[in-house]
Amino acid sequence: MEVIRDGEGESVKYKPGGRLDMSHGFLRHIRRNQIARDDYDREVKQAKEKQRRRHTNTPRRPRRPDRQVYNPRIRNGSEPGVNAEAEDWNESSSGTEMENTGTELFWLDYQADNGKITSFIVHKEDKPEVIVQRVAEKNVLDSSMRAALLARVGQEMNKRCDKR
């Protein structure tokens, strides 16, 4: 609205049919931004619905894990390199680890003073004395350390055997 003043400034008159001057175009930019925002929101909503509708009848992964199947080694002499590598691998692993295939209770990680870490899997059927002996073979342990390790391993085994 425009205000018209008289020369003296006492009487104030309003221009008839007063409206906002929209020639600056400011609201046009606001409306354009609102329309762009609405279009974007609509696209995002449609994408989410499309993603929700993609459910298939088959599950993504099998309900039961695949069974492990024993595949025997082929012992024909045609591939000596492959068989030799497999035999070397079997020889390099220690026999004590292969003997104990019972119920696994926990991993035993022993860190020596020099920072070397020795790891063993402790099984339900293992005896704490045997485990301490295996750790002592790979690390230098005095009698007090052996006794402390024996007590701790026995305590952990009893705690985990009671839970199972």
From Swiss-Prot:
Pfam families: UPF0561. Residues 50-64 have a biased composition (Basic residues). InterPro entries: UPF0561 (IPR018888). Residues 1-98 are annotated as: Disordered. It comes from the Eukaryota. Residues 1-13, 35-49 have a biased composition (Basic and acidic residues). Belongs to the UPF0561 family. This is UPF0561 protein C2orf68 homolog. The lineage of its organism: Eukaryota, Metazoa, Chordata, Craniata, Vertebrata.
